[in-house]
């Protein structure tokens, strides 16, 4: 098998298998913990702490890869996945209702929220070494796998109970590690990820303030990413509430999720060709506008067909923004800064965006209902789109680019 084909297959498998484990640790958190005797407050606390911990964990792992020669993106992903497998085994051995399971599940969710940014860095480092890899296609396959596996998992849990979740997690986790290990070596794998022109202090650690000073437009870009993902997560996490408001049921929920996943795949798969025709900066602005239109449309989605239309709008929102943000970081940051840049992006989107979307959405829904939550999501998305436009304008100025 030639190098290019090996990279393509192993990277697609890495995403597909990883998102199967992510589906278990995040989408089925409430299902698993409530079956073990935990209440809704504890479930929310576990997912919230997991997301917050990932915000810290992602930059830390990126920084360690820049200081310790043995560590690189590939080994970081493998080490974290091994830790998650050990955690899953300990969860299986725990006692229902005990604090240990909640603590261990927090660790599990934190690790799985941290790995996507490492997988992104793995791809961009490979691309920066002068080789071709279609990140969007792999990420799109991950989205499709996530959707299909989520539906299949619901059927399996209904027949076998929640204990099957950790068994499946371990099974797919082992396969994920093998897929990542099969990914061919790149520049970063020969040693330190950051042996180039990245300033370090005497102890060898990166100065994050210096990092953001080199790329001032990242302040507004990361802030915009948080706002857009808060709106995105309010819609996704509480989609069942939107479907119920429209008079639908769990079948309609599954259909809405399937529509979102199906429209993501072709856009992500052909993102490289799309970027060749439209600059990534313009694509980011377009996606943020569609994010906002989708958020406002959700407010008025009071019928099941309308919910399906909103889900279809994923084609220009999340489907463009996800690969676009990764390629944007890769394009504008020096290769030595790429790992930290991708880690901070993950912290802002899956980390802070996910946490705040979950907490804020739940808080508003409990007090005033789903419509009010969607109004807030739309307003935040609009501010996010404005900040995206501002950051893109700044980064395209000749003296600001790298």
Positions of the model-derived regions?
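A late C-terminal transmembrane helix in Major Facilitator Superfamily
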Residues: 339-367
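Symmetry-related core transmembrane helices of the 12-TM Major Facilitator Superfamily/SLC fold
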Residues: 165-182, 372-391
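Cytoplasmic helix-loop-helix junction between adjacent transmembrane helices
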Residues: 108-141
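Helix-loop boundary and gating motifs at the non-cytosolic
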Residues: 2-51, 217-256
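Structural signature of the two symmetry-related core transmembrane helices
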Residues: 75-90, 282-297
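Helix-to-loop junctions at the C-terminal end of transmembrane segments
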Residues: 57-71, 157, 267-279, 365-366
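Hydrophobic core of transmembrane alpha-helices in multi-pass small-molecule transporters
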Residues: 16, 98-116, 226, 306-320
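Juxtamembrane intracellular "pre-TM" segments in multi-pass secondary transporters
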Residues: 1-5, 184-222
